[in-house]
Amino acid sequence: MMSKYKKCCAIAVGLVYVVSGLLKVMDPVGTGLIVEAYFRFLHIPESALVANILGVVLGVVETTIGFAAVFCVWPRIIRWIMLGMQSAFTLLSLALVIWNPQMHCGCFGEAIHLTHWQTFIKNIVLMGLLWVAYFPLWETTKTKMWQYITFASSVILTVGFAVYSWYY
């Protein structure tokens, strides 16, 4: 059984993921521009369509994972997905700190601009909260039916919102 402190840490990280993902989904064009900037930074051939699609997919995935953490759905799986995503975000923000390109992180889409150092510190704090929330491995709860229903509703609304934002 997860303690209240661990649940609060999981909810805090989940809410950051939800807000970050929704802000990316709200502005698919802006998110696509951010992804294109990352393509240039990483020397990947850029494509506006691929960048826009990847931006929306990233926003939907972040929001979905965030809702799963908030509602404590599949905690054994979610902890590994979040740890992997957060590790990738942290390494990418470390690269931004080291090479200091003329771009912002895009963590919260075009809505909130953070410096490279602010992004890196945010990612370190989130990584710490993840470790507090989900480790040791055997401390998880069993998901209840209402959690599945709430999570599924949240995912459906997020995907619907993403489709609406894409076309309008």
Where do the model's predicted regions map?
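Helix-to-loop transition at the C-terminal end of transmembrane segments
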Residues: L22-D27, Y167-Y168
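Hydrophobic alpha-helical segments
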Residues: S3-K4, C8-A12, V16, V29-E139
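Aromatic-anchored segments of alpha-helical transmembrane domains
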Residues: V18, S87-L94, I156-S165
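Internal/C-terminal transmembrane anchor helices
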Residues: T143-Y168
